[in-house]
Amino acid sequence: MHSILFATSEAYPLIKTGGLADVAASLPRALLKLGHDVRILLPAYESLLAKAASQGLKTLGEISLDDINLTLHQTRLPGTRVTVWLVDIPEFSARAGNPYCGADGNDWYDNHLRFYWFARAAEAIALNQAGLNWQPDIVHCNDWQTGLIPALLSLHPERPATLFTIHNLAYRGLFSYQAFGELNLPPAFWHHERLEFYGQMSFMKGGLAFADFITTVSPSYAQEIQLPEHGYGLDGLIRYRQESLSGILNGIDTDEWNPGKDKHLAATYNRRTLGNKTKNKLALQETLGLALNADVPLLGFIGRLVDQKGIDLILNQLPLLLEQDCQLVVLGSGFPHYEQRLREVARQYPDRVSVTIGYDEGLAHQIEAGCDIFLMPSIFEPCGLNQMYSLRYGTLPVVHAVGGLKDTVQERPLDNPGEDANGFVFHSPDALDLHAAILRALDAYRQPATWKQLQINAMNRDSSWEQSAKAYEAIYANLCS
């Protein structure tokens, strides 16, 4: 059994902007079930404090660092036994809105200071200098917001082991040399083998350079980020550290995403009652104002309407797709020009295309259950969660062969799908390649026996966090040996 400080900038349902929040909710819970002592460390954002208050919030005391005092609160991750510690400074708790940026979409001007103090709090806890009478064996850090923690702990000979997980290398936590000067960091950290990155400071690089071990969220992504085209200038450092790098697929919350018990659905179902899936399709069509037709293929997309998610590929092949007898459902928000183009298509084809701008958790579940085919043409995808939700719901994904999509979705010839074929894969980020994969999916849909076999294969896949947690457990054991 190990004691683990799990440092993260978000954790569902307390605060969420992306997939990191889902991981930070599920992995600690899975580790707790394996017998480990896990404490989550989060910034005390204003909105988070309001949610935590309903769970019960206890102030543990203050941590004095240099010329400021940080307040430490304690709560629990809702619905679990996982302890959560909250680092409270006014730059977190007295600022409404997004954790990282203002309403105008620009990063908060003082993010370097905000997450520096968060790292200093983690350092104090890790060294048992926070008055908690608790010290972890391992500090598990996540993405750039925690990248300074391994760097700071490297200054102490007697310290816990450090693990740094890359969830998305595209966000490198870049700040100016002037910002570096505002932090009480050793001048030696301004070096190309440490935090300096082409004249800037990179918090992400701090995690990569100083952590004892590095993981990322899928085996394929671990390989891709060692290449210049996917490394964002950090590929050389990652190649240098490849012996201390492992890719571990994320799991999904199989209680929250369970078609057999999902409260959001018109009808629950499992592998033996797949016929009930049609009831969800008809309910979704009715809810969204589409033509009611159990036989027409219904395609879905859920995600940010940004270039990374391949929404332009969907839009560019849409005229060809609409020549087919099918329907399309889109849920998401993002770049205004993508939102506008999608709205125009929905107005033009009101009984065939539905577009909901924003995010609705219930509707997301209904799309996963009601659709036949799920589109995930991401240009890059470190792990991806929606393809695993789709597999669990027997909704066959069409994916671009990158990152975690490549590791979870397999395509085989329809005349011999075997037991591992569970979707459709295209290999270049091109609208025509995506369209060809969709046509293969539509062809399979017209073969009911084959389609059902693919659905059963998909639903048989184990996407639970238990497998992922055991892989992390093995790394923890090696770090502590």
From Swiss-Prot:
Residues that hold ADP-alpha-D-glucose according to the record: 16
Keyword field: Glycogen biosynthesis, Glycosyltransferase, Transferase
GO terms for MF: alpha-1,4-glucan glucosyltransferase (ADP-glucose donor) activity; alpha-1,4-glucan glucosyltransferase (UDP-glucose donor) activity
CDD domains given in the database record: GT5_Glycogen_synthase_DULL1-like (cd03791)
EC numbers, comma separated: 2.4.1.21
Catalysed transformations (reactions): [(1->4)-alpha-D-glucosyl](n) + ADP-alpha-D-glucose = [(1->4)-alpha-D-glucosyl](n+1) + ADP + H(+)
One biological process term in Gene Ontology: glycogen biosynthetic process
Pathway info: Glycan biosynthesis; glycogen biosynthesis
Pfam family, one: Glyco_transf_5
CC terms in the record's Gene Ontology section: cytosol
Matching InterPro entries: Glyco_trans_1, GS/SS, Starch_synth_cat_dom
Coiled-coil intervals: none
Entry-linked HAMAP family: Glycogen_synth
Function: Synthesizes alpha-1,4-glucan chains using ADP-glucose.
Record family assignment: Belongs to the glycosyltransferase 1 family. Bacterial/plant glycogen synthase subfamily.
Name by which UniProt lists this protein: Glycogen synthase
Originating gene: glgA
